[in-house]
UniProtKB/Swiss-Prot annotation:
Signal peptide: none annotated. Its EC number is 2.1.1.199. It catalyses: cytidine(1402) in 16S rRNA + S-adenosyl-L-methionine = N(4)-methylcytidine(1402) in 16S rRNA + S-adenosyl-L-homocysteine + H(+). It is an enzyme of class 2 (transferase). This is Ribosomal RNA small subunit methyltransferase H. Belongs to the methyltransferase superfamily. RsmH family. GO terms for cellular component: cytoplasm.
Length: 283
């Protein structure tokens, strides 16, 4: 499993891991951040949740030597109920992990041919294919514009309607690319990037679930406990920024977001858009 956690040293130092502390990893993925938390201080325990059962199962194997210090939970962070637990720190890494992105059958990437799926939680019924092949033109254009900030949203939606049915990621990517002026088709950013982002957000209801999590999570912290959120695009970062700032029980610790150093981006290009924001519970 080749997934490199992003901004890991900045996150771990920002959370100030305490001996015998209890931490919530709200987006376990393949366990990179959890492993670093457990190694940062003695007798630390982590509650690790993820909506992706495949990632959760893999992490239980990868973190087998730490399992006595980890409680695994299959849940979306918006639905998680800590009951009576209070945490010394909470983290959420909002990015799609590299393993999901590089697994063609998950349908997240236009770089690999696979079915248009994009579900983080494989138990849910709505897929990218259902949206692409059954939604009306106006609704498609709206999600491309709102969640992808795609300026050609109407043109792309119209072309999708004309080209349906579309079954694979590469078919959709080709339709989108053909809507873009030729000189922009082969730049650094693939022309389908924004459409794929918008679809993934819609399929998984990412922003509404993030909003719920950000409203609930501060109340799960002990006084003096910290929360760190890593976002990867402007819609997420804006929501994180305003939610942390508007929570009366939190003190924001990052006036501006922490971003990766050049050497991290050189090793892991997917880190380039990451932003970390931190806050501490006051009362």
């Amino acid at each position: 499993m080749n997934h490199i956690p992003v901004l890991s040293s900045e996150l771990i130092s920002g959370l100030v891991i305490r001996p015998r502390g209890l931490y919530l990893d709200a987006t376990l993925g393949f366990g990179g951040h959890t492993k670093l938390i457990l190694a940062a201080a003695p007798e630390v325990k982590v509650v690790a949740i993820d909506q992706d059962k495949q990632a959760l199962d893999s992490s239980q194997t990868l973190l087998a030597s730490y399992n006595s210090n980890i409680q695994f939970c299959h849940s979306n962070f918006a639905d998680y109920d800590p009951q009576n637990l209070k945490f010394d720190g909470i983290l959420a890494d909002l990015g799609i992990n590299s393993v999901q992105l590089d697994t063609p059958e998950r349908g997240f990437s236009f770089r690999h041919q696979g079915k248009l799926d994009m579900r983080m939680n494989q138990q849910q019924t709505i897929t990218a294919a259902k949206i692409i092949n059954h939604w009306e033109e106006v609704k498609l254009a709206n999600i491309f514009y709102t969640y992808g900030e795609e300026r050609l949203s109407r043109r792309i939606a119209r072309k999708i309607i004309e080209s349906r049915p579309l079954e694979t990621t590469t078919e959709l990517a080709e339709v989108v690319a053909n809507c873009v002026p030729y000189k922009y088709r082969y730049g650094r950013i693939h022309p389908a990037t924004r459409v794929f982002q918008a679809l993934r957000i819609e399929v998984n209801q990412e922003l509404s679930r993030l909003e719920t999590f950000l409203k609930n999570a501060p109340h799960w912290l002990k006084i003096g406990g910290r929360i760190g959120i890593i976002s990867f695009h402007s819609l997420e970062d804006r929501l994180v920024k305003h939610s942390l700032r508007n929570a009366s029980i939190l003190k924001v610790l990052t006036k501006k977001p922490i971003q990766p150093q050049d050497n991290e981006v050189a090793i892991n290009p997917r880190a380039r858009s990451a932003k970390l924001r931190l806050a501490e519970k006051l009362s």
